[in-house]
């Protein structure tokens, strides 16, 4: 972040930096970012080879920094949003959920692979290198899962997968929440449901535990 933060802020942009560890978070804050996207190892995409789950990483970072935090990695509904807020986040990022949305420009084959995935149907790749990756399980990614070779060259044909629908052409970056997504739905419907679930969860928790305050 040291290279670009000042330039971006001078151009009037708000800068949130994605961080996979406490050390990265502290470095980003020192560089003057406006906020952090704290992403646990559950998330899809480019990862820290030494991945840390959101339930550990998010409250750890929150305890050490004062900037706004967007939680990423494992968040897709009102319940997980409420959990993120309880752990110190101000917002959530739902990457895999939005990749699977009706308006997403990626090929239907990728969306359907997310919908049909179990919670164990992602693989962690490239751990011996940097960045590591979390992707949906296919024949290709299953072969690459324990490879010590750098797999970044596989993205040379990414458009054949992303927009052409050939799931074996490249690597489909996908988070573990794929196992909880059961349909391709419009974004507006997803957001409305997340909001409704969030307030239901908060209301239920308040009613269940408010009385304990006076014990």
Label every PLM stretch briefly.
Residues 1-67, 78-79, 83-87:
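Alpha/beta enzyme core
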Residues 48-70, 76-212:
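Conserved active-site-proximal phosphate/metal-binding subdomains
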